[in-house]
């Protein structure tokens, strides 16, 4: 789990997301509180529940991007889901409990990777030994048994050195590797996912779990495959499962996007029961319940839930009161200005302008964005957002793609040339489209 301070988390988010300081502070505090809770005495720890967050703001202002970046920073089981993918129990579609099952799968995979990383050095040594046994078969005595002392012979050590230096990488050998398990795909009816998971496991066991097959491959590929195989042997699956369930229960973070789409708007008179039903199904998860997964029972009492929505067709007060009460921290994200667009184009790591410069550099075309050119792009995107539908920073992608379309198409024929994207160039490519509202609606 991440031990970063709130200030460090915000600083890291600043390098990818422009503005939205309130939202960044809220998620940073929530993430740090996960660490603080684990430092408490066990009796008090069980009483401290996470303060779930509701992020409100128009589309394209950074809600989803905050979730993506948080997932990388958290170093904890994290899952992002769309609320619209789920339906009420009894309707065709996914049930909300599958969120916890998927999160547990993420935790199992994450814990397994961490455990394998810890034994990587030993696993590599074992893999090297297996390859050296193929390259230099051990000498046998009269009874066919391996003679001792061969492992430390000078020739073997010389080959081990060459192997580590990569001098044998392209040599082909025949090696015994674990045969891939034959997957049995079973379509699960709603609510029966657990049973189908068990059936799949049963069929895989029947097909033989630990069969090996001989494969011819280069030593570099064999070393990778055998290291993974040896690493899996050195970890205890039961311990991993226990650790993963502990992690998911105490550090798990669930990000639910588009929560406003399951609100029944105040002007809505349709009989859309399943929308409100999804909210009611979410209640026990957010409040704390026990969910059955193929890895065991998982409690959701101390998981952190972060929800977000644009709330253009509905209001936060349209959520059912019980769910509103379980999302105590409200954060409003602000709409982006032309200045924000200008910063988005230049400040974040791997900004849009950086990406286009790097992409065209692969064709030996040098692209340079001037200060006034970037300002004009930002103003154009902001103007189109104001006159048509406001889609936030996503408009920049559309505008930039339109702006760079010609040079991207001709780049392969302009080897060694340069392009300066200034205000005049931007106006010549976008001026007419931005000025004509009807064209903007269809093209930008």
Curated annotation (Swiss-Prot):
ATPase subunit of a proteasome-like degradation complex; this subunit has chaperone activity. The binding of ATP and its subsequent hydrolysis by HslU are essential for unfolding of protein substrates subsequently hydrolyzed by HslV. HslU recognizes the N-terminal part of its protein substrates and unfolds these before they are guided to HslV for hydrolysis. It is found in: Cytoplasm. Keywords: ATP-binding, Chaperone, Cytoplasm, Nucleotide-binding. PANTHER family: ATP-DEPENDENT CLP PROTEASE ATP-BINDING SUBUNIT CLPX-LIKE, MITOCHONDRIAL-RELATED (PTHR48102), ATP-DEPENDENT PROTEASE ATPASE SUBUNIT HSLU (PTHR48102:SF3). One of its GO terms (cellular component) is HslUV protease complex. It comes from Aliivibrio fischeri (strain ATCC 700601 / ES114) (Vibrio fischeri). This is ATP-dependent protease ATPase subunit HslU. A double ring-shaped homohexamer of HslV is capped on each side by a ring-shaped HslU homohexamer. The assembly of the HslU/HslV complex is dependent on binding of ATP. Residues 141-161 are annotated as: Disordered. Residues 147-157 have a biased composition (Polar residues).
């Amino acid at each position: 789990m991440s031990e970063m301070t709130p200030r460090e988390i915000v600083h890291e988010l600043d390098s990818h997301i422009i503005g939205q300081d309130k939202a960044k502070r809220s998620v940073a505090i929530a993430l740090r509180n996960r660490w603080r809770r684990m430092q408490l005495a066990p009796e008090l720890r069980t009483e401290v529940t996470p303060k779930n967050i509701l992020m409100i703001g128009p589309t394209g202002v950074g809600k989803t991007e905050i979730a993506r970046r948080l997932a990388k920073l958290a170093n904890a089981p994290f899952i992002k889901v769309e609320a619209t993918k789920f339906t009420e129990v009894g309707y065709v579609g996914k049930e909300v409990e599958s969120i916890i099952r998927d999160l547990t799968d993420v935790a199992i995979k994450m814990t397994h990777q961490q455990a394998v990383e810890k034994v990587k050095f030993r696993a590599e040594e074992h893999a090297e030994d297996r390859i050296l046994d193929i390259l230099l078969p051990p000498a046998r005595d009269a009874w066919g048994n391996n003679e001792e002392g061969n492992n430390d012979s000078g020739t073997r050590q010389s080959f081990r050195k060459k192997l580590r230096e990569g001098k044998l990488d392209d040599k082909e050998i025949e090696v015994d590797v674990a045969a891939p398990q034959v997957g049995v795909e079973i379509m699960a009816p709603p609510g029966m996912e657990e049973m189908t998971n068990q059936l799949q496991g049963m069929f895989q066991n029947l097909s033989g779990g630990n069969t090996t097959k001989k494969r011819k491959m280069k030593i570099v590929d064999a070393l990778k495959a055998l290291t993974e195989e040896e690493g899996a042997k050195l970890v205890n699956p039961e311990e991993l499962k226990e650790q993963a369930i502990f992690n998911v229960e105490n550090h798990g973070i669930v990000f639910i996007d588009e929560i406003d789409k399951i609100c029944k708007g105040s002007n809505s008179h349709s009989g859309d029961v399943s929308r409100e039903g999804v909210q009611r199904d979410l209640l026990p998860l957010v409040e704390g319940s026990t969910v059955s997964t193929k890895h065991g029972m998982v409690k959701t009492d101390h998981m952190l839930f972060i929800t977000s929505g644009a709330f253009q067709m509905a209001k936060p007060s349209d959520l059912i009161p019980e769910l509103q009460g379980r999302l105590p921290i409200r954060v409003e994200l602000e709409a982006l200005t032309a200045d924000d667009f200008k910063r988005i184009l230049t400040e974040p790591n791997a900004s849009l302008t950086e990406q286009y410069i790097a992409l065209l550099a692969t064709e030996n075309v040098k692209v340079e964005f001037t200060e006034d050119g970037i300002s004009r792009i930002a103003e154009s995107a902001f103007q189109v957002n104001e006159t048509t539908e406001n889609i936030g920073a996503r408009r920049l992608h559309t505008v930039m793609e339109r702006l760079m379309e010609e040079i991207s198409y001709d780049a392969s024929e302009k080897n060694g040339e340069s392009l300066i994207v200034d205000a005049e160039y931007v106006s010549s490519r976008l001026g007419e489209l931005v000025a004509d509202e009807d064209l903007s609606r269809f093209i930008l």
